[in-house]
Regions:
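N-terminal amphipathic/basic-hydrophobic helices that include classical n-h-c signal peptides
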Residues: 1-10
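Conserved RNA-binding domains used in RNP assembly and mRNA/RNA metabolism
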Residues: 10-103
Length: 103
């Protein structure tokens, strides 16, 4: 019951200035081309090396969640472009520094 309540309880408003910006490198599945292939090519199939950049909104033992977009309207409290990556797939998390452009 506590787990269910946690899932349906609205999340507190997120302070985006306290959420780290990151670049994450992870391994992902790679689909092989269709048709007949030499067995050695199938056995040696590489994994895809992927990267994502965004806000690191979840970082625990099971997964990380990256959110690319954030609505700055305080009444909206929505994010977009998110991806959940199993923790075991993650190879590297690089923390990025946010700098503001000057005119």
């Amino acid at each position: 019951l506590q787990l269910i309540l946690k899932l349906v309880t609205p999340m507190k408003e997120m302070n985006i200035d306290k959420i780290p910006m990151v670049r994450v490198t992870w391994l992902d599945a790679r689909d092989m081309e269709t048709g007949w292939l030499p067995i050695k090519d199938i056995v040696n199939a590489p994994l895809a090396v992927c990267q994502e950049v965004g806000y690191l909104v979840v970082n625990n033992d099971d997964k990380i969640v990256i959110m690319r977009s954030w609505c700055v309207d305080k009444e909206d409290n929505h994010g977009g472009g998110s991806i959940a990556i199993p923790r075991g797939w993650v190879r590297k998390i690089e923390y990025l520094k946010v700098e503001y452009a000057t005119r």
